[in-house]
Amino acid sequence: MNKKSTVDLIHGPILPALISFALPILLSNIFQQLYNTADILIVGRFLGQDSLAAVGATTAIFDLIIGFALGVGNGMGVVIARLYGARNFEKIKEAVAATWILGIILSVLVMLMGFFGLYPLLQYLETPAEILPQSYEYISMIVSCVGVSFAYNLFAGLLRSVGDSLAALGFLIFSAIVNVILDLYFITQLQLGVQSAGLATIISQGLSAILCYFYIRKSVPELLPRLKDFKWNKALYVDLLEQGLAMGLMGSIVSVGSVILQSSVNSFGAVIISAQTAARRIMAFALLPMTAISASMTTFISQNFGAKRPDRIVHGLRLGSYISMAWTSFACVFLFFASPSLVSFLASSTDGYLIENGALYLRISSVFYPFLSLLLIYRNSLQGLGQKLLPLVSSFIELFGKIIFVAWIIPWTGYTGVILCEPLLWLVMTAQLYFSLSKHPWIKEGKKLLATGGKS
């Protein structure tokens, strides 16, 4: 294993280890966001507002697909991180072999569902008729190549599961640059239209997947299975599938709620769609440090769970919460003042109505970011502890809450209801996850050990 890029999450001071592990994840997330932001900036600037709205109208579907792929990859990585914490290297190879087989099967199923269901779904979401063809062109490209997203997220999840969050960063930076170059070339030189933005994203993710594979082959060979490792192990397959689907479905359930909410956004017309698209992209960037810390908690807790260190789990949980809360408080203040300028820049527009609504979205939702930070920390911690059902409960709370808002509240309050929907649900979900986590026996044991100065 490449020790230089691998962070030891089981031994030594926790804060430096968490920061060292989370920083490459943060930078990776930044460049991951650049995939979509490059699409938005280039599409809006060179193809016009209708094309921008066409991409924006598919945001929830895009998040549904990519979120599922990311969740499955990270979920299976949780199992491998637990095995790595226990230093069970033979079982790790079997687990990796199983993730490859399951990844192929899930990719085919998602592609088939997308092939038959995409156009009716866009119609159900009340996508405006003038942008419907472009929306379908863009998102159908993403869905037809979903296997590429699965491959990259599986490989990146493997690297993170053993504490190597740095390696995937270099590959992702390279592919993000390629994505921007291809966007510009396809749209401005070949004039291929909005579909080419999706093609550029797929090619870029494919490069990341290929580079990750060759890095693992050279530097982390213990992650590569042998032919004899491709064997049926019911308990292992069930564990991987349950954890992978739990995290994949969690992201998908959240995204289904977003798809439902998107139908309300689409009903307000192309200008509001563009405002929402720009505001959501800014929000995603503002929350990147928080999401990096919460993502690192999954691996940290899973490895220490395998190593039987409840004291480190509780200590790490506290430190992660403090860091995340501090950042989101800063982001709230920053967005209050900078929102109008940021929305105008990202939407490539001086339309006062668009800027006003995009800025309003950011100013209201950012007040609730500290609660969102705790929500993600608690949920990822439960996943790291191997809990499958409790994190899903929070996702169902969000789904049903969005259905209630779309059916009864937004028709009465208008776009303000769209803005308030998610923040109010964050409060409920955070409370549910806090009580679920605090009752976990490992958290109770870790608190006792820290209170008495003991060590597991």
PLM feature segments, named:
Residues 1-22, 80-145, 191-245, 301-367, ...:
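Short alpha-helical transmembrane segments in multi-pass integral membrane proteins
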Residues 11, 15-34, 38, 61-68, ...:
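Residue-level signal for short hydrophobic patches within transmembrane helices
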Residues 20-39, 141, 152, 175, ...:
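Transmembrane helical elements of multi-pass membrane transporters/channels
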Residues 25, 29, 41, 78, ...:
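Transmembrane alpha-helix boundary and packing residues in multipass membrane permease domains
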Residues 30, 34-53, 122-129, 185-192, ...:
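Helix-terminus/linker motif at the lipid-water interface of multi-pass membrane proteins
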Residues 52-112, 149-168, 276-339, 372-386, ...:
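Small-residue-rich hydrophobic transmembrane alpha-helices
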Residues 73, 141-160, 168-176, 197-212, ...:
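Short runs within selected transmembrane alpha-helices of multi-pass transporters and secretion channels
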Residues 114, 157, 183, 212-216, ...:
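Structural signal for membrane-spanning alpha-helices in multi-pass inner-membrane proteins
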